[in-house]
Amino acid sequence: MPPDIHDVFGSALAALDTQQLRRHRRVVSALDGAMVQADTQPRLAFAGNDYLGLSQHPALIEAARQGAARYGVGATASPLICGHSPAHEALEQELARFVGLPRALYFYAGYAANAGAIPALVERGDALISDALNHACLIDGARLSRADLTVYPHNDLAALERALVAARGARRRLVVADAVFSMDGDLAPLPEMLALCERHDAWLYVDDAHGFGVLGEGGRGSLSHWRVPTDAMSSRLIYMATLGKAAGVAGAFIAGAPAVIEWLVQKARTFFFATGAPPMIAEALRASLQVIESEGWRRERLLQLRTRLACGLAALPWPAPASQSAIQPLLLGDNGTALRVMAALDAQGIWVPAIRPPTVPDGTARLRISMSAAHTPDDVDRLCAALLAASARPPV
């Protein structure tokens, strides 16, 4: 007799509880860019990825409203059937121009972009070389590809080169890395990585989910931040970025050489086997690109707030690695401490999520502090004061 489904998953959930690893959803409504209502209570949030505070921007809301009035609220089909509207076409052209690459392809989600593109680019018999701290969607894309996978230590260029040399017999070699690592906030050394790919005849696939809109001239992302030459970008590099973080809306795009993008149109299963995103989303994103470029004060405020936060965290007993992005980790070690400090902040009306394994390695549970241009200096000071009070409180 097969095991009872309730017993199987009830026991598995109980094991998660024992390890302090069960996650819980909260019912959240945005009040403004920095404040949310979570489980009916207002809280100052350092939890999301709305880095520029654009999710509530009037221009984006109005663009979405007009898009819905013109196109309706659904795409109705795959982009290869009848789900590719004039709004989607215009967005892709504007995204390509924005990042300085020849062509772009819009996906309904960042996870879908990576899970579909990577298996379209490499397959069994190819080599895929991945940073140890890459996001789960890059890891899953690598697994789905069935390429021979090598994982190199985080940002270790010497190890990356050894992996490239070891894979020289492969038909294709693809190096995959986040541009900004989502749980640490540090940057991948893209110029050096691209140089290694040039030297060893490999391609570089970059996920700029947390750099797009925040880094670079006019918010153009990590390629602009590192001043990667345009010719190198189009010949070796495949660029991906999400549009639900700094851009404030939803979806993702991949940009690169025209032949690469056309290949993804034909072979990325998450692109053509899914209904397209609503055209109203594309219109909101077109408005977002204009705001990202024109309202540079948002990036300037982020930089100022990051400096202020670093000064406040220096007074705490826990490590806070230097960050060049809108993400600031506070390393607490064990799951119990991370949950205790999160609860102490929550009691003060501040929401900062505790991040635990398997999202981060064992023994590195942390608070992931996400900054937004919607925050104020007083918000940062309030967070630092609450953390200092929590650090002085003995464990229960």
Swiss-Prot record:
Q: Which CDD domains match?
A: KBL_like (cd06454)
Q: What is this protein called?
A: 8-amino-7-oxononanoate synthase
Q: Name one Pfam family in it.
A: Aminotran_1_2
Tell me its EC number(s), please. 2.3.1.47
Q: What class of enzyme is it?
A: transferase
Instruction: List, in alphabetical order, the Gene Ontology terms for molecular function in this entry.
Output: 8-amino-7-oxononanoate synthase activity; pyridoxal phosphate binding
The pathway this protein participates in, as annotated, is: Cofactor biosynthesis; biotin biosynthesis
Name the UniProt key words of this record, in alphabetical order.
Biotin biosynthesis, Pyridoxal phosphate, Transferase
For the biological process aspect of GO, one term held by this record is: biotin biosynthetic process
Which positions does UniProt annotate for pyridoxal 5'-phosphate binding? Answer: G110, Y111, S182, H210, T242
> What quaternary structure, including any partners, is listed in this protein's UniProt entry?
Homodimer.
Q: Which PANTHER family match?
A: 8-AMINO-7-OXONONANOATE SYNTHASE (PTHR13693:SF100), CLASS II AMINOTRANSFERASE/8-AMINO-7-OXONONANOATE SYNTHASE (PTHR13693)
Q: Family assignment?
A: Belongs to the class-II pyridoxal-phosphate-dependent aminotransferase family. BioF subfamily.
Cofactor(s) needed for function:
pyridoxal 5'-phosphate
PTM annotation (N6-(pyridoxal phosphate)lysine): residues: K245
Organism (species): Methylibium petroleiphilum (strain ATCC BAA-1232 / LMG 22953 / PM1)
